[in-house]
Amino acid sequence: ITSLLVSAYPAAFPVMMAEMASDNAMDNGPLFSVEFQSQEDAYLWQDIVTDTDEDAPQGLWDACYLAIASANHALQAIETMGNPSSLAPQRGEALICRAYGHFILANTFCEAYNYETASKKLGIPYAINPETEVSPDYIRGTLEETFSKIAADIQEGLPLIDDNLYSVPKYHFNKKAGYAFATRFYLYY
């Protein structure tokens, strides 16, 4: 389970996409070229449909759901073993990882959370079970439902995290990292 959780962290982030679409980017003229078409598309506020690299929307979407799938497989394995208390820290980490992946997706692909309108805005599909079929149909749900599920995973997972689980906790959700993520999430919620 512990080894499986290494893959429960997304291998892509929305940083480049967001930066290129912000006022932090500028056109340096014809002598400067971008590495990926998705960067130029984001800069020009065009739909990004050509690239599937990790900095493009499809790459981010796939990386986050791949990480979420790993977290769900870990959670299912723990449940299959009878939810032993010895695996509580791994369960906590898996729940936080699942929440984190969904948060990145919701924060990137949904409208900003507003408690007055969240019940009317589209959220993202919230995957809570390991996949048993290829390309299943998910119900997208509302933004309110998405954020509520993220909050539930955080609230259940945080108390279970144990900093003594790893000899090098820097690359896992330890207590401090878990609470830092929770703090960031609740700034939006």
Question: What residue spans do the PLM features occupy?
Answer:
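Short coil/linker segments at helix-helix boundaries
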Residues: T108-K149
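Acidic, glycine-rich segments characteristic of secretory precursors and extracytoplasmic regions
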Residues: I1-A25
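Active-site substrate-recognition loop segments, prototypically the cytochrome P450 B′-helix/B-C loop
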Residues: A25-Q39
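Well-ordered alpha-helical segments within folded domains of soluble proteins
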Residues: A67-L75, Y126-A127, G178-R184
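Extended, well-ordered alpha-helical segments in internal regulatory regions
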Residues: G101-A112, Y126, A182-Y189
